């Protein structure tokens, strides 16, 4: 999606927010059409908790196959909007580049915004309650289904931004079978496990450690 938007708009700065919006809409549809249906039919049993995980992994395979069918399996290039050459301090060039700085500031900004939403707003309270104790949340009057959809939309927007920024910050090359695509998924999951699957700051700390 990010590649297509960059190609059509010719402007990375326009493509980035559009990718986030489309990522949010796509994730919301996945939750409504797939995850919600699975949860309704698999609320009990030893594998109930991992059914959504298995489903999303299957969906990932379908998406990768679809990408290959539409755009082919050849590598496609996305040009970075900023220089990837490190800043110069005197005669020395440091490892931090303008592109690195953009990614760093974006991550910090997103963590602060999401942290505020989760900790300081009624929406955040509803999101946490729906995740930890959906039955109790529903008894308290929270529309768990709608809140879960909002949570997926937020995750989709953040994921779209992360994918597009990491692509241009890395090799700039993306394809369904690219190593960078696989590493992004693998390291993202490992970072979440290291930092705690229920902790946003912990997940960021896990990513920094990696």
What does each model-found stretch correspond to?
Residues 10-59, 66, 205-210:
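Alpha-helical transmembrane segments within multi-pass membrane transporters and channels
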Residues 38-41, 47-120, 147, 171:
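Transmembrane helix-bundle core of multi-pass membrane transporters
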Residues 113-152, 181:
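Membrane-helix/interface signature in polytopic inner-membrane proteins
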Residues 23, 186-210:
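Hydrophobic alpha-helical transmembrane segments of polytopic membrane proteins
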Residues 11, 132-134, 199:
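Short loop-to-helix capping motifs
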Residues 3, 20-26, 57-66, 106-115, ...:
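Hydrophobic core segments of alpha-helical transmembrane domains in multi-pass membrane transport
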Residues 8-10, 120, 146, 196-197:
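Helix-loop interface residues and adjacent transmembrane-helix termini in multi-pass membrane transporters
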Residues 117-119, 151-192:
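Inter-helical junctions in multi-pass inner-membrane proteins, predominant
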